[in-house]
């Protein structure tokens, strides 16, 4: 059936309105901790430093992930100023990319109505509207994985030669996926495509793909940073690829251990109430029973792609003990399409079309309420209140210490242009090797010992010099601190103290030199 131009305009209007709603939600809450505070400030440091090779947290190299998020955030901050919203614009742009590419692919594979309903289902879901404006790497890699799979799948047109241009777009998406979050950026699209091509009897057609040009394009996009980084930091490959990829995947010493059922429950929640359609209408068992007679039919290729995509990635992330909600985002587009197909079956059975509008409204309301609640929760843990006080009181040569914790959002909201001194028992932290903020900092200091000089022992805050500030959790026993500190401001989660001492500042404890070349605008004195 051919649809009039008005139907396509309606579809694009749906895409635009859902994306605008996501951008509005992004304004309504402070940075969540630890992720958003951490990653937003890494992008800010990149803008200040002008060092596009080494992402830095508090001036210390931070190589947990490749740098695409930080590059794009630095560009966003430069163009729009430093704010939580401009930080969130980067994942929001990728969420928009995910929505647009899914719409175009579903329109090609199925129909205009299925494509538009897929957009409405995905774009109104909790998983999309929250993760799409959450500052971390997950939405970026999910968008590029999705684009790679769609492009590769669309390139295998029935009874035709493989589309070279779409294949090259798929290779490019794999390159950006690698720069977003590492190996999964090309491993997962490859896994899905191999399984799908084998299932549908098309694997022999991979010979038609532009492998040489594709691999060259992928290499030009993704490899220069890894090569240059390895040349300057000899342990980069071992730390980023071996430690942060393979060790985390097979190890049991990291955070967030969950059972095999975890992602099934997460997906039901992320897509609620749309997920009720999956539970009632989409039965993998029934789909598997027809494989002998129908799996190679072109009419079945779209649905088989969606199921294989969902199952392969879900199983891949269910194997390790450590499981994080955002990992499963690449599964949302195929599930949204499966739900749209399920809705078509509901209509055939005579169900009222009005139920779609009801579920759409419920989904949007749930997303808005959860975003509001997330903001309340984040505000209770945020250091934004004392950061704004500090920004208006601090002098250029003042020194800021933190102890008994690390408020990731403090440097971001206070717009600090020098690193914070972090005063804890670092020897004990290295012995315990707990997977938390201390490990991020001392492992990063191994790459740059000069930058690591801001990691000081607790005794450094016993006799503060004039112009020193101290930030500590609100529940700290003030009696345990030196009498040379006095409370300057108390926030909801953190307390700001100022040094009473008039000691002359020791030049040996000056903030270590960094690559920063300019300060960001902060409160006028």
Model region roles, listed by residue range:
Residues 21-25, 365-370:
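Gly-rich Lys/Arg/Thr-decorated short loops/hinges at beta-loop-alpha junctions or inter-strand turns
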Residues 185, 407-411, 478-479:
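Short, active-site-adjacent cap segments at secondary-structure transitions
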Residues 250-251, 263, 369-373, 441-443:
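Short glycine/proline- and acidic residue-enriched helix-loop micro-motifs
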Residues 337, 343-369:
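Signature aromatic-anchored transmembrane alpha helix within multi-pass, membrane-resident enzymes
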Residues 382-405, 416-525:
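Luminal/periplasmic acceptor-recognition loop/helix of membrane-associated glycosyltransferases
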């Amino acid at each position: 059936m051919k649809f009039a131009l008005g139907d396509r305009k309606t579809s694009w209007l749906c895409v635009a309105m859902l994306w605008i709603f996501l951008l509005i939600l992004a304004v309504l809450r402070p940075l969540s901790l630890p992720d958003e505070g951490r990653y937003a400030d890494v992008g800010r440091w990149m803008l200040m430093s002008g060092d596009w090779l080494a992402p830095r947290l508090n001036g210390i190299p931070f190589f947990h992930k490749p740098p695409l998020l930080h590059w794009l955030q630095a560009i966003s901050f430069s163009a729009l100023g430093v704010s939580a919203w401009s930080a969130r614009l980067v994942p929001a742009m990728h969420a928009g990319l995910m929505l647009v590419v899914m719409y175009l692919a579903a329109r090609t594979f199925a129909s205009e109505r299925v494509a538009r309903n897929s957009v409405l289902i995905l774009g109104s879901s909790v998983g999309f509207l929250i993760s799409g404006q959450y500052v971390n790497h997950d939405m970026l890699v999910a968008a590029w994985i999705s684009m790679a799979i769609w492009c590769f799948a669309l390139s295998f047109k029935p009874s035709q030669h493989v589309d070279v241009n779409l294949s090259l777009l798929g290779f490019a998406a794999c390159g950006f996926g690698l720069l977003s979050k590492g190996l999964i950026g090309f491993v997962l699209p490859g896994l899905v495509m191999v399984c799908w091509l084998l299932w549908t009897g098309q694997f022999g057609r991979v010979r038609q793909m532009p492998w040489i040009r594709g691999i060259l394009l992928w290499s030009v996009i993704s490899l220069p940073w890894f090569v240059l980084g390895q040349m300057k930091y000899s342990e980069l490959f071992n730390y980023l690829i071996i430690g942060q990829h393979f060790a985390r995947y097979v190890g049991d010493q990291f955070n967030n251990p969950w059972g095999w059922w975890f992602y099934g429950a997460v997906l039901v929640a992320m897509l609620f109430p749309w997920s009720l359609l999956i539970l009632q209408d989409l039965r993998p068992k029934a789909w598997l029973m027809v494989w002998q007679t129908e799996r190679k039919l072109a009419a079945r290729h779209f649905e088989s792609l969606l199921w294989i995509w969902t199952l392969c990635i879900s199983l891949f992330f269910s194997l390790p003990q450590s499981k994080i909600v955002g990992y499963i985002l690449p599964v949302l587009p195929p599930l949204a399409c499966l739900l749209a197909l399920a809705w078509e079956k509901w209509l055939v059975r005579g169900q009222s079309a009005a139920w779609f509008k009801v579920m759409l409204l419920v989904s949007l309301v749930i997303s808005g309420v959860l975003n509001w609640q997330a903001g309340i929760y984040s505000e209770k843990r945020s250091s934004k209140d004392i950061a704004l006080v500090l920004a208006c009181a601090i002098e250029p040569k003042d020194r800021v210490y933190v102890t008994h914790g690390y408020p990731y959002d403090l440097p971001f909201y206070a717009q600090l242009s020098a690193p914070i001194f972090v005063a804890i028992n670092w020897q004990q932290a290295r012995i315990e090797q707990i997977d938390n903020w201390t490990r991020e900092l001392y492992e990063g200091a191994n790459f740059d010992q000069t930058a690591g000089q801001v990691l000081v022992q607790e005794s450094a805050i016993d006799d503060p010099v004039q112009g020193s500030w101290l930030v500590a959790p609100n529940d700290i026993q003030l009696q345990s601190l030196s009498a040379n500190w006095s409370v300057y401001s108390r926030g909801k989660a953190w307390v700001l103290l100022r040094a009473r001492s008039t000691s002359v500042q020791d030049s040996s404890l000056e903030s270590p030199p960094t690559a920063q070349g300019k300060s960001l605008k902060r409160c006028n004195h």
